[in-house]
Amino acid sequence: MLRGVFVTGTDTGVGKTVVSAALLHRFRGTPGIRYWKPVQTGIEADDDTAEVLRLAGAASAQALREGVRLPRPLSPHLSASLAGTSISLPPLMDLAWAQPDGDRWIVEGAGGVLVPLNDRELMVDLISVLGLPAVIAARSGLGTINHTLLTIEALRARAIPIAGVVMVGARNPDNRVAIETRGHVPVIGELPRLEPFTPEALQQAAEGIARGGELDALLGG
């Protein structure tokens, strides 16, 4: 059984990879801290695993190879269909259960929680069977309250614990308060949009991830 967190998002392109890299760097002192992207679409143009390792300043041994690698940057079910294949949960679970018990994992999803993996299952079903609490990557700006609260509802409908929300973009105190009070979840970090998109910028921004409490229990040494 994996220990750690599953980084999901309120949408695609909200900053899941940046949040994953920030967590990997923030908890770099934890023995056995590792990263895994179970499903990667658009592999010819986007390699999130390589990007997380680059930004976090982590070694290649700290990442597990993707369980599914698909060429087109589309929803996982559609990218798989166009590649003449399909995504099945059991092989992903076999890969997860084969990992050492003592490791701590930052697992990154693709898209949002209700993106389809196949004709029957959604990304949230993968989160559920992995048994990991979710960290939600959310935009900081207009529209994020609705998107984040919907994501929280979808996770809670499946009894998936939520470790917290990380907001990405310019600080917006009003949106932060609305998400915390109406969603009953902590905002555990606020990260700026990285400019430039460098390891130095990411590693400085990673200090915006709060240490302590549940997150330390999940990812700390």
Segments the model singles out, each with a brief description of its role:
Residues A56, L130, R182-V185:
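Short, structured coil segments at secondary-structure junctions
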Residues K37, V135-A138, A163-G169:
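Short internal beta-strands
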Residues L2, V18-S86, P90, D94-A98:
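N-terminal phosphate/diphosphate-binding loop that engages ATP/GTP or pyrophosphate donors
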Residues F6-A21:
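Glycine-rich phosphate-binding P-loop
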Residues I152-G221:
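C-terminal lobe/tail of nucleotide-utilizing enzymes
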Residues P91-N118:
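Switch II (G3) loop of P-loop NTPases
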Residues N118-G141:
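Inter-motif core of Ras-like GTPase G domains
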